[in-house]
Amino acid sequence: MTSPAVVWVLGSDSDLPHIQDGLAALRELEITFEVRLLSAHRTPDAVDELSRNARSRGVKVLIGVAGGAAHLPGVLAARTTLPVIGVPIPTDMAGGLDSLLSIVQMPAGIPVATVAAGKSGGRNAALLAASILGVADARVAAALDAGRKTMAEKVLGRDKEKGIRVQGA
């Protein structure tokens, strides 16, 4: 069995809907991944084992997904020097500001790259992981470049189609 390049670690199965666009992006880019459900607080030994063994398994990037206290990405980063991306899950507190701050406020020396809360966060985490992989994988880099070009063409097409032009004095 091929080792996954990316491992998603979710604090709860309720986080799954927030990463679907990200999973689709990795599939489109043909990047191998696995999804694990582990809690920094309820299964700390399993999180520790996953983090410590990720590199030897061939994993290149870890993505931690959590809401509320959202310690999972930081706990992953504390046990590995692999890149860790944190995805904050929206909560009732200011749309996930608590989650975002829990992930982004890491002490010096234990970095966690952090993306937006919500659906765009899951997709952007996948694309950031792909960008990291693309440094050493020309196929992934080319696919990302093509995706950006397609995105730009769609926006320019809508601009031309809608023809919205506002001029002022």
Task: Annotate each predicted stretch with a short phrase.
Residues 15-19, 44-47, 66-75, 94-97, ...:
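Short glycine/serine/threonine-rich phosphate/pyrophosphate-binding segments
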Residues 35-56:
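N-terminal beta-loop-helix "entrance" segment that forms/cooperates
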Residues 3-42:
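Glycine-rich phosphate/diphosphate-binding loop of Rossmann-like nucleotide-binding domains
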Residues 4, 17, 35, 44-45, ...:
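Acidic, glycine/proline-rich low-complexity segments that act as flexible tails and inter-domain linkers
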Residues 5-10, 34-36, 62-64, 85, ...:
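Short glycine-rich or small-residue beta-strand-to-loop segments that form or flank ligand, phosphate
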Residues 4, 10-17, 21, 97-169:
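C-terminal binding/interaction regions
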Residues 13, 38-40, 67-68, 89-92, ...:
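Short, ordered loop/turn segments at secondary-structure junctions
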Residues 50-88, 92:
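Glycine-rich phosphate-binding loop
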